[in-house]
Amino acid sequence: RTDLYELSRQWGDLVKRSRSKQLQPEEYSTGTFTLSNLGMFGVDRFDAILPPGTGAILAVAASRPTVVAGKDGSIAVKRQMQVNLTADHRVIYGADGAAFLKDLAELIETRTESLAM
């Protein structure tokens, strides 16, 4: 198992080598899970297309200030972002994908310190 810090270091190396066009095809042509982050370009919603050989892809959009109603009926402005999971149901059971999104939402909404790299 890889912890979050090691994953961050590995990700940083992949990004660096990708930007310098040093990745080999086998490093980006297959995988079990892909993350597509167009949020860093200000895109606030999109659907990511599942690449062949991939079990699922998570589309992460930009966060935006949004007017929301509180549980008590109050009105507030909160930052919200859209994420969208596309999964190959031959590989990933839909209920597992839904549970993943629920856990991700809880992490983002209540435990933001877990997301810092």
Model-derived regions: residue spans:
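C-terminal catalytic/motor cores of large multi-domain enzyme assemblies
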Residues: R1-M117
